[in-house]
Amino acid sequence: MPKIERFKTRHLLRKREQKEELDRIERQLRAKVTGLGTNTQFEEGITDDGSRVLLLGGTIVFFELEGKLFPTLRALLDGIVSIPKIVVDMGAVKYVTNGADIMRPGIRSVDDGIMEGSVVAVVDERHGKPLAVGVSTMSSDGLRAATGGKVVISKHHVGDELWEFGKSVE
């Protein structure tokens, strides 16, 4: 996850660059980017630590980590992109929001179509709100069959620097 204090550089993407980025996001996430108007303008930012982020209206909506673009929780909350979900029980919420990886015993349900290495949203069972974005270590069937172990590696969660930076922009 990028360490964000300020941006080294920040610039608007050209229409062609924006289309290329959206195509890349849709290809990597296997999900459609929606909720964007026709005049939507993305910005690209480079943080102090060299991490690359995409902004929409001053809010970070995607960040690059290990060569892959991930949606932020704000992008999920705003309906910009919809990715497969893994629902966790309320007992796991405290750990997930502190950045813990997701363990199989805390999972209540799993969306179909998750493949090993897929980017997934971790949501709570009561409110259905996203708590974290991570990478699945198993397919949907594997997740359902597993009885223990780490099943999602957390990359971004409520309360981390990326989340806090987004709060300061609002």
Walk through the language-model features, giving the residues of each.
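Beta-strand/loop-dominated core regions that host nucleotide or nucleotide-derived cofactor-binding catalytic loops
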Residues: 2-51, 56-59, 64-108, 113-116, ...
